[in-house]
Curated annotation (Swiss-Prot):
Domain of life: Eukaryota
Molecular function via GO: acetylcholine receptor inhibitor activity; ion channel regulator activity; toxin activity
Principal place of residence: secreted
Protein's name according to its UniProt entry: Short neurotoxin VAN-29
SUPFAM superfamilies recorded: Snake toxin-like (SSF57302)
Species, as recorded: Laticauda laticaudata (Blue-ringed sea krait)
Entry function: Binds to muscle nicotinic acetylcholine receptor (nAChR) and inhibit acetylcholine from binding to the receptor, thereby impairing neuromuscular transmission.
Gene Ontology terms: cellular component: extracellular region
Location of this chain's protein in the cell: Secreted
Keyword Ligase: no
Signal peptide positions (record): 1-21
Lineage: Eukaryota, Metazoa, Chordata, Craniata, Vertebrata
KW Glycoprotein (keyword) present: no
């Protein structure tokens, strides 16, 4: 009986899919490469590039933000796709 109950609990956990989250790189161009899990429901990663007095700046993270003109934005929907 205990084995049956344990089996049902395991099957329930597997079937519920305990919440997959997207993983994206999340560093600025001057920082070491890191990635993180995005908040639940956030299914996109972005790579944002622009130029200023320091040169080309690259920012990466979760989501797909609105940007001003002159900023190159690439959004994607797979893990670590924004490198």
């Amino acid at each position: 009986m205990k084995t049956l109950l344990l089996t049902l609990v395991v099957v329930t956990i597997v079937c519920l899919d305990l919440g997959y989250t997207r993983r994206c790189f999340n560093q600025q161009s001057s920082e070491p490469q890191t990635n993180k899990s995005c908040p639940p429901g956030e299914n996109s990663c972005y790579n944002k590039q622009w130029r200023d007095h320091r040169g080309t700046i690259i920012e990466r993270g979760c989501g797909c933000p609105q940007v001003k003109s002159g900023i190159k934005l690439t959004c994607c929907q797979s893990d670590d796709c924004n490198n």
